[in-house]
Amino acid sequence: MPEKVRAELKTIIRNRALEVGFDVVRFTTADPDPLNAKALNEFISQGRQGDMAWLDNKNGRRGNPLALMPEAKTIIMLGANYGPNIDPIEIQNNKGKISIYARGRDYHDVLKKKMRKLARWLAETQKCGIKIFVDTAPIMEKPLAQKAGIGWQGKHTNLVSREFGSWLFLAEIFTTLNLTPDLAETDHCGSCELCMKACPTDALAEPYRID
């Protein structure tokens, strides 16, 4: 596929994704990511995953998108903003707080509906193979999002977007389309440690490491 055609197709896909309700659309390759897979294995070997048994990576699937779809060439990374209109830290200081993401409808259901609409259109118009994922498969979403240019993993280990901060739900479409990847994002945290100071459980003993 000529580069001009690939660029035009990316624009068409991006516009369609925005139409169905996503706020960020980026593209990256489906290549394995051994560096981040190694970091995850070290995290698990130190027992820092707690009772999150689903993070297990013994079969090596995390960090290797091709284990989920061997024929995939491109991953379309999608982000949906769920940021509130008010600062949740400054309200109801004398009451227990429920995480913003849990105050509305289950985001898995919301995003899957949007993704199915987008994926159906993509499969019908481009005659390509696709698979969709919304935080339910062994995928290292944050490293993929950084590789696609959506944002970077901050010192709190969450994804940070220049436009949306850390208020993004992530989802992916794996496809056999061979599209030009976007540029990866770089770390812009610098000397800032606001997230570490704000952590209510002091789980961030050092930058980029959550206990």
Give the ranges of each region predicted by the language model.
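Auxiliary alpha/beta "docking" domains used to position bulky ligands
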Residues: 1-188
